Amino acid sequence: MSTGPDASEQGAYQELQCYTLAHGDPAFLHQHVLDAWVAQHAGAATKPIGLTFALAGLYLHVDCGFSGRQVQRAHMTLGQRKRAWPTFVLPVERGAVRVRQVLAAPPGAARDRAIAAWCGSVWGAFHDSRTTIAALLQEYDIWPSRNGRS
């Protein structure tokens, strides 16, 4: 559902942020959590740049295999010039996986896999935005082949 998070969900998100920030993984898993959360909870008050960056991050991670660090670099590239950011139709359902389910997974590999599943679930809900996101990233020369992916 596209309604804002309740206090329990917000608390779970904050706890998951603490987990990913303390993770110590150089791949920077935290970026994927930010992107999934923003896209899943976007609403009328969400700025186009925020949703664009979140969807770009999810596309690069889920479809192209980018690490959180690579997504972070892509966000920096996108932010280098001012522009009008695209607007997206917000799907009613934003993915079946929720942050509380991710946090319920045991810390470590299981939770990291749950984060990946959450990202895939949210990105799948925005499948109609894929062409717009891919074209935007190509415009900025942010493309899988640039990072050793085909």
PLM regions and their residue ranges:
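Intrinsically disordered, low-complexity linkers and terminal regions
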Residues: 1-150
